Amino acid sequence: MINIFSFICIYLHSALYSSSFFFGKLPEAYAFLNPIVDVMPVIPLFFFLLAFVWQAAVSFR
């Protein structure tokens, strides 16, 4: 269980800070998309959490 928690923490840390260190800025014409691009790395985590919500809805059958 601790390994899953560590993986999630590392994923969130890299998702929050990687855009400022490893990637350049978007071109000026696409600057209005910056908020969306900042959230995009976290989207797979939402699907991961959705799997648990779905299983809870069907009582973990």
Swiss-Prot record:
Pro-peptide region(s): 1-24
This protein's GO CC annotations: chloroplast thylakoid membrane; photosystem II reaction center
Subcellular location: Plastid, Chloroplast thylakoid membrane
Transmembrane spans: 40-60
One GO BP annotation of this record: photosynthesis
Entry membrane topology: Single-pass membrane protein
Keywords: Chloroplast, Membrane, Photosynthesis, Photosystem II, Plastid, Reaction center, Thylakoid, Transmembrane, Transmembrane helix
InterPro entries: PSII_PsbK, PSII_PsbK_sf
Primary localization class, coarse: plastid
Source species, domain of life: Eukaryota
Functional note: One of the components of the core complex of photosystem II (PSII). PSII is a light-driven water:plastoquinone oxidoreductase that uses light energy to abstract electrons from H(2)O, generating O(2) and a proton gradient subsequently used for ATP formation. It consists of a core antenna complex that captures photons, and an electron transfer chain that converts photonic excitation into a charge separation.
Membership in a protein family: Belongs to the PsbK family.
Subunit details: PSII is composed of 1 copy each of membrane proteins PsbA, PsbB, PsbC, PsbD, PsbE, PsbF, PsbH, PsbI, PsbJ, PsbK, PsbL, PsbM, PsbT, PsbX, PsbY, PsbZ, Psb30/Ycf12, at least 3 peripheral proteins of the oxygen-evolving complex and a large number of cofactors. It forms dimeric complexes.
Protein name: Photosystem II reaction center protein K
Organism: Pelargonium hortorum (Common geranium)
This protein's encoding gene: psbK
